[in-house]
Amino acid sequence: MLKRRSNALITLSRTKLFPITTVAYYHRRLLNQQRRAVSTSPKKEIKSLEDLANLDSLDGVDTELIRDLINEHTTKLNIKKELDMLKKFSQEEESGHEIPVKRFIRPLWMFILMGSSVYLLLHFSWWKLEHEERESQLKKEVEILEHQLNELIIQDKTHNTSRGKGSNESTHMKPWYRRWFW
């Protein structure tokens, strides 16, 4: 059995009868296959996976080279994904530090509406109390004025009755314009 590591061939034999002849046979056979594969394959240098994709077959290509190219490409992709993830985390962190205004618009409107409704309610109750107080003051003034008017009417009646007995009733019957001019 042959194993390939980097650029050296390591031979292992599991048969104990003819170990030397089997090793030599396998060694020569593999070397011949490699020479044919190298001579028939195009002499391009394979540097990337795209170069491998352009080949017709992978018969003469070293498996370690393919493995290294695949690992290199996966490493590049992993690094790219990690960078994208780090950018995403940094953007989330920056956006986490900034407090969005949208977060406060609804509570601000709620506060304004609640505050204005409380203000209107208190203003209405204050206006109602002032109105009732003013109404009670005006009622008292009306009562005082009615009382004064009643007193004056009573005084006038008593004054007219005492004066009315001695004066002419005919003068009261004349119209006012005749009393002035005749």
From Swiss-Prot:
Q: Which domain of life is it from?
A: Eukaryota
Sequence ranges on the Mitochondrial intermembrane membrane side: 128-182
This chain's protein is named Inner membrane assembly complex subunit 17
Answer whether the UniProt record assigns the keyword Cytoplasm to this protein: no
According to its UniProt entry, what is the function of this protein?
Component of the INA complex (INAC) that promotes the biogenesis of mitochondrial F(1)F(0)-ATP synthase. INAC facilitates the assembly of the peripheral stalk and promotes the assembly of the catalytic F(1)-domain with the membrane-embedded F(0)-domain.
Entry keyword set: Chaperone, Coiled coil, Membrane, Mitochondrion, Mitochondrion inner membrane, Transit peptide, Transmembrane, Transmembrane helix
Q: Where in the cell is it found?
A: Mitochondrion inner membrane
Similarity field: Belongs to the INA17 family.
Q: Which gene encodes it?
A: INA17
Q: Which organism is it from?
A: Saccharomyces cerevisiae (strain YJM789) (Baker's yeast)
TM regions (residue ranges): 108-127
| Residues of the transit peptide | 1-45
How would you summarize the oligomeric state and partners of this protein?
A: Component of the inner membrane assembly (INA) complex, composed of INA17 and INA22. Interacts with a subset of F(1)F(0)-ATP synthase subunits of the F(1)-domain and the peripheral stalk.
User: What are the GO cellular component annotations?
Assistant: mitochondrial inner membrane
Could you tell me the membrane topology recorded for this protein? Single-pass membrane protein
**Residues forming coiled coils:** 128-158
Mitochondrial matrix compartment segments: 46-107
